[in-house]
């Protein structure tokens, strides 16, 4: 079965490996992810979602594998995305999702346990990524 969700993984290494994450004003802390549209590859979907949710242009650099969420039944494809510019420590991007929201972006230390502010599905996704990138 093909992946129906794509997750854009943007990493930075400043002595600690960080992953790009954001705070959704209604749904807590999350990773950039969304649905794969008909005829779209999961890598292209990850790049598109990164532009829509974060305003970042990127290229899909590396496929990090697929994960089946037992919570939702969706299959997620993780793609490491490379961005051309240096990204700040934090910023806010207005995303058009669900009528429009300000998403607050930040860097989460990948090997740190996520707090209770993360939805359980994203905690599980981070566990998958920690194992994949270890």
Where in the sequence are the language-model features?
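Conserved N-terminal beta-strand and adjoining loop/helix that marks the start
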Residues: 1-19
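Conserved hydrophobic "DFG−1" position in protein kinase catalytic cores
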Residues: 10-11, 21, 81, 107
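Short polar/acidic secondary-structure junctions
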Residues: 13-14, 68-70
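Conserved Nudix-box catalytic region and its N-terminal flanking loop in Nudix hydrolases
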Residues: 15-52, 56
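Structured beta->alpha junctions
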Residues: 35, 67-68
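Active-site-adjacent beta-strand/loop module that shapes the phosphate/pyrophosphate-binding cleft
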Residues: 69-114, 121-133
């Amino acid at each position: 079965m093909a992946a129906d969700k794509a997750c854009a993984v943007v990493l930075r290494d400043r002595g600690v490996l960080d992953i790009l994450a954001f705070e959704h004003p209604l749904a807590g802390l999350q990773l950039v992810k969304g649905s794969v549209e008909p005829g779209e590859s999961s890598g292209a979907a990850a790049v598109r979602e990164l532009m829509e949710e974060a305003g970042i242009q990127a290229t899909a650099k590396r496929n990090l594998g697929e994960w089946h969420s037992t919570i939702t039944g969706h299959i997620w494809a993780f793609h490491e995305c490379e961005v051309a510019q240096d990204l700040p420590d934090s910023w806010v991007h207005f995303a058009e999702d669900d009528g429009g929201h300000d998403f607050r972006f930040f860097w989460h230390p990948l090997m740190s346990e996520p707090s209770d502010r993360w939805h359980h599905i994203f905690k599980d996704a981070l566990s998958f990524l920690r194992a994949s990138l270890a």
